[in-house]
Design a protein with these regions (language model features):
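Inter-helical turn/loop segments and adjacent helix faces that build the functional surface
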Residues: 12-25
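Mobile gating loops/cap/lid regions near enzyme active sites that modulate substrate access
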Residues: 1-2, 11
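NAD(P)-dependent Rossmann-like dehydrogenase/reductase catalytic/cofactor-binding core
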Residues: 3, 7, 22-28, 32-35, ...
Length: 138
């Protein structure tokens, strides 16, 4: 459950690189940062860190990032759409698990997590929960 929560939020960021000029390098950096934050997230909540590097973590992040609903939403957020606008325009009838999770637990995570350690995850949460443009503070 812990790794699923972390992966859902992380995969939303993996496709958000489209707003950056050098998107391949940025995409690689986002994936690296996602994995790093997933490991910290799992440790913070008492999960097993090695899960991050297995199929439930890295494997699921890869699958989600190359074509899942979370990464599709991340692409729209990276293109500059607000969450509510992108949801209504492109994914109105689609469940985006990472976004649903952010809405459900975002407030608690913002209280629990340090922005220095989780800039990517907290940027995604803020973007979705507060319907703001995606700005990654890393």
């Amino acid at each position: 459950m812990i790794i699923g929560a972390s992966e859902g939020l992380s995969s939303s960021s993996a496709k958000s690189e489209v707003k950056f000029k050098y998107f391949h390098n940025t995409s690689a950096s986002l994936i690296h940062k996602s994995i790093s934050e997933m490991a910290k997230f799992v440790k913070h909540y008492g999960g097993k860190s090695d899960t991050v590097y297995g199929l439930a973590g890295l494997g699921d992040l890869y699958v989600s990032a190359i074509g899942g609903r979370n990464s599709q939403m991340g692409k729209y957020l990276g293109e500059g759409f607000l969450y509510k606008e992108a949801k209504k325009k492109f994914m109105d009838e689609v469940t985006v698990e990472g976004a649903e999770l952010a809405i459900e637990v975002g407030k608690k995570l913002k209280q629990d997590l340090n922005e220095k350690d989780f800039p990517l995850m907290l940027s995604i949460i803020e973007c979705i929960c507060e319907n703001k443009k995606l700005e990654i503070s890393w």
